[in-house]
Amino acid sequence: MLLAVGAIIAGLILLVWSADKFVDGAAAAAEHWGMPTLLIGMVIIGFGTSAPELAVSAIAAMEGNSGLALGNAYGSNITNIALIVGLTAIIAPITVHSQIIRKELPLLVGLTLIAGYQLIDGELSRTDGWVLLTVFAAVMGWFIFQGLRNKDDSIEAGIEESTLAHPMPLRNAVFWLIAGLVLLVASSRMLVWGAVYVAQSLGISDLVIGLTVVAVGTSLPELASALAAVRKNEHDLILGNILGSGIFNTLAVVGLAATINPLQVDPEVLYRDWSLMLALTVGLLLMGFGFAGRSRIISRLDGGILLLVYVAYTGFLLTTMIPATG
């Protein structure tokens, strides 16, 4: 138990440090390569930091643990929006000024609806998995096309200004881009191992582990990257990170797990967990678009509401599921 606790502490410390280096490398590399920074946020930061989710769900599927595989993916999406966006907005309100992000938000809502439709029959077959992976490949191509078309997006000017203030040679940028990502994944795996060991010692079910402990652990790279980005005032990089990760989890993580081994879907996954994931995604859409006379900003009040939802959901999971395992 002491070794597991030590892994959690060491993983957290290494995670925060490596995330800061990774964001620096990503922004500098984007400037050198002439790539839109939001594209870096979507593809490298958003998808790259989702590698822990991919690994955990793939291994869980190989072992026939559908609850852990799905709980990790959907729990990470819930954590990303409710906990990470909520906490980040409380620290500093997030301004939504990128035209690209206002396209990605409705896309994520649509993909979440597709995911829910696949859950209705109580199973995610290999065919369902291949459908998700095919859609993922198409979305990736669309991301790249849109990113290259929008080189003048306002986010790029802001990131160029910040990177020019602290120029980094391309060699150093690439080094920290790769090393930072490797350390992010390694430290998150260290943390998840410790957290899962502790949770299992307490007798918590696999589904709850996936939705809470594992989801939070594998989402910590997104949290660390978001906190580093808000410190640098790179607001669209924050949302690019979260949206990219959400799309990756919904399509690639679940899709790969289902192609490895068909996943059995418990009823509560659809009616409780997926429903909350959809509600949070729609809520983020409304905040990002600024409907009903609102400014396009995720305020501290919005962040507080998201964080409260996360605390209530996690508390509900623990109070309803832990007794059932005893």
Region spans (language model):
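Hydrophobic alpha-helical segments, chiefly the membrane-spanning helices
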Residues: 1-326
